[in-house]
Amino acid sequence: MAVADRLAERGLEIPPAQVIPPGVRLTYRRLVRWGDVAYIAGHGPTNGESWGSKLGKVGRELTVEEAVAAAELTALNVLGTIERELGGLDGIACWLKVNGYVNAVDGFTEQARVINGFSDLILDLYGEDRLAARTSIGVPHLPFDMPVEVDAVVALA
């Protein structure tokens, strides 16, 4: 079954591309393809021109459950970049590496649970044999006060 069909089965849609706020200059590419590998820059829980989740620290402004949902939305944004840049979602042979960053209060220890929101969607869409190695890290701040940011590396078929 095509990845787009699996998304539709779950009632999920790829959000519009992130619109960079006026006055903000970001000097990078969202995806770089080098041979049969694609490197995907850090993405957050955006929905086009707006934030698709609350902003702030997990454990203060966001509950763990809200952060898990933000991580799932981040996965949808990463998929959107892949779809726009590579022309589809079915050409991924394997998710090689995922780095998840959680903007959290001091002492927060559930980073892995939060980033499961990203990984669980990838698992549902691509299966266990294409699931990435992963790191989940707690950080004191993220750009724009995002609750989560994720970057990834995928092998292309």
What positions do the PLM features span?
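N-terminal presequence-like segments and the immediate start of the first folded domain
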Residues: 1-76, 80-98, 104-157
